[in-house]
């Protein structure tokens, strides 16, 4: 029979890690998760996340609308200059110039909400990772028979994996919002006479506001679902095959 030799000192360190992890996890379930559920539920009820009129989220776009007559004259002068221009480097530098407007700021209302949301995303992913590791360390040696508790562990682990995937997607979604908004602002600045690009910026802000509320809700629900399913199945998760004492029939 193949065996792996483990130094007692190394095994002792692993045992300390396991005990510390179990203690942290039980503390999370006993006090931290209920606390976060309550905090996030209160956050969802704040006026900042319950704006009935989404047009109030509109951020000013400091992009002046050009005068058609002046723009036409400017375009004609530019064409004439390009014909006369022979220095390719100078022409390239001219093409790289930004739009003729000042800096366009982010939507401060959205940014403030995201500054509160991002630490919550980081926190729930870390806590979920901790609880997932705890669950994996409870999985017993693979044997035939009496595997109902192990099946319960597998089902809960599947739920945790699904939650982790969803929560990680929140970080990507936030980055995507800024990327898309930046593109929309750039288009609005480059073609200020096109009202659709201006409106697109506001539409993206409104959509992100609704996404923020949904993300807070999903984080709260993640804590609640984890707390509920682990509490209901705690014995099966911690001792999937029950007590090790022999059973008499």
Curated annotation (Swiss-Prot):
Inducing factors: By interferon gamma.
Key word Disulfide bond present: no
Pfam family for this entry, one: PA28_N
Lineage top rank: taxon: Eukaryota
Biased composition regions of type Basic and acidic residues, renumbered to the chain: 68-98
Region called Disordered, residue ranges: 60-102
PANTHER family noted in UniProt: PROTEASOME ACTIVATOR COMPLEX SUBUNIT 1, PROTEASOME REGULATOR PA28
Function: Implicated in immunoproteasome assembly and required for efficient antigen processing. The PA28 activator complex enhances the generation of class I binding peptides by altering the cleavage pattern of the proteasome.
Subunit composition and interactions: Heterodimer of PSME1 and PSME2, which forms a hexameric ring. PSME1 can form homoheptamers.
Family: Belongs to the PA28 family.
Protein name: Proteasome activator complex subunit 1
Phylogenetic placement of the source organism: Eukaryota, Metazoa, Chordata, Craniata, Vertebrata
């Amino acid at each position: 029979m193949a065996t792996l030799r483990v130094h007692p000192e190394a095994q002792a360190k692993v045992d300390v890690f396991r005990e510390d992890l179990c203690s942290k996890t039980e503390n999370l379930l006993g006090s931290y998760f209920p606390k976060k559920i309550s905090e996030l539920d209160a956050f969802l009820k704040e006026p900042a996340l319950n704006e009935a009129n989404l047009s109030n989220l509109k951020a000013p776009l400091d992009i002046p609308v050009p005068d058609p007559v002046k723009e036409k004259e400017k375009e004609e002068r530019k064409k004439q200059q390009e014909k006369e221009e022979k220095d390719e480097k100078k022409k390239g530098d001219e093409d790289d110039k930004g739009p003729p407007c000042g800096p366009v700021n982010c939507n401060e209302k959205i940014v403030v909400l995201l500054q509160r949301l991002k630490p919550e995303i980081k926190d729930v992913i870390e806590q979920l990772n901790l609880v997932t590791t705890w669950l994996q360390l409870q999985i017993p040696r693979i044997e035939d028979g009496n595997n109902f508790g192990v099946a319960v562990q597998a089902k809960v682990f599947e739920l945790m994996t699904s939650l982790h995937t969803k929560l990680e997607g929140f970080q990507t979604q936030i980055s995507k919002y800024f990327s898309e908004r930046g593109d929309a602002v750039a288009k609005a600045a480059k073609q200020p006479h096109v009202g659709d690009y201006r409106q697109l910026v506001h539409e993206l802000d409104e959509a992100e506001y609704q996404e923020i509320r949904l993300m807070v809700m999903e984080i709260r629900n993640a804590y609640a679902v984890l707390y509920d399913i682990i509490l209901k199945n705690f014995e099966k998760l911690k001792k999937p095959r029950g007590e090790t004492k022999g059973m008499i029939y």
